[in-house]
Amino acid sequence: MLADGVPVTMRSSAPRHRAKASAPPSMTPRPIRIFDTTLRDGEQSPGASMNLAEKMEIAQALVALGVDVIEAGFPIASPGDFESVRDIAAAVSGATVCGLARCNDADIDRAWEALRHARQPRIHVFLATSSIHREFKLRMNEAEVLARAVAGVTRARRHCADVEFSPEDAARTEIDFLCRVVEAVIAAGATTVNIPDTVGYATPSQMHHVIKSLRDRVPNIDRAVISVHCHDDLGLAVANSLAAVEAGAGQVECTINGIGERAGNCSLEEVVMALKTRQDHYAVETRITTRKLVPTSRLVANITGIQVPRNKAVVGRNAFAHEAGIHQDGMLKERRTYEIMRPEDVGLERTDLVLGKHSGRAALADRAKALGYQLTAEQLQTVFDQFKALADRKKEIYDGDIAALCELQFAALPEQFTFEGYTVTTASGATPTVTLRVLQNGVPQAVTITAGDGPIDAIFLAIEKLTGI
């Protein structure tokens, strides 16, 4: 660890020659870290908020999937975010657990408070660096931004040996200044430097140029892992991430199903399968167990309510569907004529099995597992009994029905609540007030709150406050 006050030698403008990022196919593939931010950036998708139990379920699925880093949340953002980061950090093993913080002492200390019991903690600090952010958001000059970035990393290193720094809006930051910032934060102790395309503005050739420039012009770049975090506003998040890997990036930040703010983030399943399918080109490898991609994708879709488009690459229901006669003929003769990936490699099993009232417990358990649910024997029996009752009323049971029955097992309340009634007071432009009344194990309980984006949201917030889920 570097001591405070170590001078930084700025030699960013002098190009340095390095070995090519991609190794020849005959060499051992270069490892690429997968940093999943479904629980933080992904949750910023409108309507994608998750409770603690759901976040914990996704976190455990991400560990099983093989991700290297789980960004569990932004601890200072809310008490709920703090609790989820704290509980996930304490429970998860097998992956680094990361918390986000701005470059100020309060954020960083709060992040560490949430992460302190993690087996492998990481503090991720960020500060905008582009000229438009410096002028209009931060109202700071280059020297002030540089000093605050260094101070943030230095503070984080006092708590944690693993510190990531992100120059927000890096893709629109002047390359000379970006190189100076990266060199300074590495000297201050950053172990990962993440390059975000915050607004999804970059192109693949531009992203390649930025990463290559950092590798060539930052003298101490070998002391940190270069990461990339791309948004999908122009539909280029995956392409930009692949270009960054090709230029030498060692970590890709992404989300399951590509969910995230606005148009979303780089899709984990797409970038992972691109790197695996075209390993001949990229000469890299990840730790991802790809056969768990589809189950994890469906789990996240079921929890967030953001369904996967049928034609989405890798995990969409049509990703391995062939209807054209010529394609079907080729597939019957040799699958490789029209398939560059095997469906079983991503966890999609081709089956004509239709579940109905004559189906058995084993078939139901197999389908539930394929949808991403690990049921205990007791949970399976409960779901099976409910499934049989439903099958008597419906000719055919769909995946959504099975998922709904399984979700009931994971959403069970620790105590019995009986709904009694509610009162809502609202007006145009006003924040609604809700009074919710329930019986908790026969004892009357009530709560009144003034919050929410409309009466329905307010009711759900009241339920959450009263029940604690």
Give names to the regions the model predicted.
Residues V63-G66, A89-T96, L115, R119, ...:
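Structural signal for hydrophobic packing residues in well-ordered secondary-structure cores
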Residues L2-D4, V8-N104, D352-R361, A365-A370:
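N-terminal capping/small domains of soluble enzymes
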